Regions:
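The feature marks the mature, well-folded catalytic cores of soluble enzymes
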Residues: 1-302
Length: 302
């Protein structure tokens, strides 16, 4: 099941509500072909289900633990009290199934972590160590908390790669995604004149040093960066890494850049050969500095 938290006139989407609703309707129609859908309505501050939704763990017997972490508007940048109450509400209403686990003493957004399902958590230093999240906890303390709550063996920290226009302090789901067969898909940049070039190059070099738990290098697949997109003179954090994996398909954000959209979809399709690759125009979504994966949260069938 996939959760979408719906935009409305009391959110920041108000000036472009018709435009974003059209995009959400397209996402809804596409996802419903493959999975059940949970639509969450008011009250909510915003619509980024990836960050305020439960983070789910599934055990070997198929049981689920629904981890309810604190969401504080990406380090107290925005109001989040209503979003932070959504998980308890949908759990009490019976819309999600599993064991409720209260983790509200720790700030963690779903978009800030990636897991390989085998014990490794990937995250970014600039996000999890950012002010107004879990300070005064030190990096080592945060790492131990992640390993404990997420039943992980280790945490790999990425120290580079912040996208211009990103107000999450560098969520990993805009930069690096985990795929089958020890594959990491990551955003690259070949234009030395691009302001993101140096940082993304450093990220690429760091990824080359990472090893699996068996000591082998990861298979790295470089996704293109979309050409810069601006709104009111400010660059928006468009990225192809923010794709959504669902049963039978991968939904890929596109930006009306046919050559790069097609290249990204081809590369993602090669990594997920057993799934349909479907493009979703996300030019509306990035006007609020997120994309496809950010809008959604998955839950297992229990």
């Amino acid at each position: 099941m996939v959760q979408l938290t719906w935009p409305h006139a009391k959110t920041d989407w108000a000036p472009m509500l018709d435009e974003i609703t059209e995009t959400y309707n397209e996402m809804t129609a596409t996802i419903r072909k493959y999975e059940d859908l949970l639509i969450v309505g008011e009250p909510n501050n915003d619509t980024w289900a990836r960050d305020h939704g439960f983070i789910t763990l599934v055990d070997d017997q198929g049981g689920a633990k629904l981890l309810d972490f604190c969401f504080n508007g990406w380090g107290e940048k925005f109001e989040a009290d209503l979003d932070n109450a959504i998980n308890r509400r949908i759990y009490d209403e019976g819309k999600v199934k599993g064991e409720y686990v209260d983790c509200l003493d720790f700030v963690l957004e779903g978009g800030s972590i990636e897991s390989d399902g085998e014990g490794t958590i990937f995250t970014t230093s600039c996000c999890l160590l950012a002010p107004h999240r879990n300070q005064p906890m030190a990096k080592a303390e945060i790492e131990e908390r992640l390993k404990r709550d997420l039943c992980a063996k280790r945490v790999l920290w990425i120290d580079y790669g912040h996208l211009v226009g990103d107000d999450t302090d560098g969520h990993i789901d805009t930069l690096v995604r985990v795929a089958p067969n020890y594959t990491l898909l990551y955003i690259g940049c070949d234009d030395e004149a691009d302001e993101q070039y140096d940082d993304l190059k450093k990220m690429e070099e760091q990824l080359k040093t990472f090893r699996t738990l068996d000591g082998e290098p990861y298979k790295l697949v470089k996704l293109p960066s979309p050409r810069p997109i601006y709104e009111d003179g400010e660059r928006l954090p468009a990225t192809y890494a923010n794709f959504l994996i669902i049963n039978g398909a991968v939904l890929v954000p596109t930006y009306n850049q046919p050559d790069l959209d097609a290249e990204a979809m081809k590369l993602i399709g090669e990594v997920f050969p057993d799934r349909n690759i479907i493009g979703i125009d996300c030019r509306s979504v990035i006007k609020q500095h997120g994309s496809l994966h950010c809008c959604t949260m998955q839950y297992p069938r229990i």
